[in-house]
Amino acid sequence: ASKGNGRGPYVQADLAYAAERITHDYPEPTGAKKAQLSTVSDYFRNIRTHSIHPRVSVGYDFGGWRIAADYARYRKWKESNSSIKKVTEDIKDNYKETKTEHQENGTFHAVSSLGLSTIYDFQISDKIKPYIGVRVGYGHVRHQVRSVGQETITVTPKPKNGTQGGPVKSTSPIPAYHENRSSRRLGFGAMAGVGIDVAPGLTLDAGYRYHYWGRLENTRFKTHEASLGVRYRF
């Protein structure tokens, strides 16, 4: 222990590497709805991405256990998908080709997380203190998707009497689909790490935390974070 026999208020700054995971938790669509993009969570149902972000905490050290409030902001994740589908039909004296083009753009942003933690320190030496803790967090997530497209129909006459007529094309837009959601959820997590006292009142902190953000529509969102930071006790 250092200042105040290890007791007192403290501030902490961390740089965290977060692995963000979204998994869908509902039956796959079938029948007429199988090819339908119906909700934002359909689009973002299997995210595997990561971000590096800062985190700040303020807390109080009771000399064996701590409480802390923390705040973090995350990186916006973007994705674009495009698809082309062609269908050719033989209709009487013509060949009809229907080409459907789709362009989908989406963003997913774990905007912020505000949490409250209870942490227990194990003092195995004067300077090294492993710890474990639990966290309750209030998370804000925004996600949106926009889909646009067009349909091109090409009608080509079949050869008749040795002559071949030219193709006739017509293009029409597909109504745009846009959805924007903002979700706020209460989630729970756990943490573990080690603190190393490097100077009176100054501790180097290396830790891991898991946080379950809760359900977003029909998906589950969670993060795994590894962090490195410094803690200063007043």
UniProtKB/Swiss-Prot annotation:
Q: Identify the InterPro entries for this entry.
A: OMP/PagP_b-brl, Porin_opacity
Q: Which family does it belong to?
A: Belongs to the opacity porin family.
One Pfam match: Opacity
Subcellular location per the Swiss-Prot or TrEMBL entry: Cell outer membrane
Q: What is this protein called?
A: Opacity protein opA65
Function according to Swiss-Prot or TrEMBL: Implicated in a number of adherence functions. OPA proteins are implicated in pathogenesis and are subject to phase variation.
Sorted alphabetically, the keyword list is:
Cell outer membrane, Membrane, Signal, Transmembrane, Transmembrane beta strand
**Origin superkingdom:** Bacteria
For this UniProt entry, which residues form the secretion signal? 1
Recorded GO CC terms: cell outer membrane
Q: Where is the stretch described as Disordered?
A: 154-179
* Molecular functions (GO terms): porin activity
